[in-house]
Amino acid sequence: MPAVKKTNRRAQILQALAGMLETSPGQRITTAKLAEKVGVSEAALYRHFPSKARMFEGLIEFIEETLFTRINKIVNEEKDSLTRCQLILHLILGFAEKNPGITRILNGDALMGEQDRLRARIAKLFERLETQLKQVLRERKLREGKTLSADEAIIANMMICYTDGRINGFIRSGFTRKPTEQFNEQWAAFKQMFV
């Protein structure tokens, strides 16, 4: 039974951290403030996570697991390459919209002043997303016999830049300008540029 409680406490700590990232933009989150929010001592936090960096890594693991599990599902279920790209971009933007605090980790804002390895891990996450899009576009040529108006690496990079821009706009607006706002219209413009 204690293992269940530990898992729940870990999840509670991560949820509190994500909540504080959402409600306290621009402010550094200390372990003292986090412990107060969770209702435990700082020592109790450290029983579950050896450092604040590990807490952020826990949230990054959540991001990676959520996004890539769903991306794999999209790739396995959807056969049309452009539809796959559309669904992947919408997934990323929808995830950001539903998790505003975690979105500050995605753009690196919440990681300022934290360990370099955290920012490197987020950079790697975006590289993996771009590689996934590039692979989907490459398969369009191979499986569907259809070409694109530009190299798939350029198109994949533009899609990631678009996604990154929408995430940053969401943060700049104080989480009021939703990343998925006008997505379908913007996707239609993307399709015209690339097909």
From Swiss-Prot:
Gene Ontology BP, a term: negative regulation of division septum assembly
Protein location: Cytoplasm, Nucleoid
Domain HTH tetR-type residues, every copy: 7-67
Gene3D superfamilies in alphabetical order: Tetracycline Repressor, domain 2
Residue ranges of the annotated DNA-binding region, renumbered to this chain: 30-49
Major localisation: cytoplasm
Pfam families, per database record: SlmA-like_C, TetR_N
Record keywords: Cell cycle, Cell division, Coiled coil, Cytoplasm, DNA-binding
Lineage: superkingdom: Bacteria
Alphabetized GO MF terms: sequence-specific DNA binding
UniProt feature coiled coil, ranges: 109-141
InterPro entries in the record: Homeodomain-like_sf, HTH-type_Tx_Regulator, HTH_TetR, NO_SlmA, SlmA-like_C
GO CC annotation terms, alphabetical: bacterial nucleoid; cytoplasm
Family per record: Belongs to the nucleoid occlusion factor SlmA family.
Subunit details: Homodimer. Interacts with FtsZ.
Role summary: Required for nucleoid occlusion (NO) phenomenon, which prevents Z-ring formation and cell division over the nucleoid. Acts as a DNA-associated cell division inhibitor that binds simultaneously chromosomal DNA and FtsZ, and disrupts the assembly of FtsZ polymers. SlmA-DNA-binding sequences (SBS) are dispersed on non-Ter regions of the chromosome, preventing FtsZ polymerization at these regions.
Protein name: Nucleoid occlusion factor SlmA
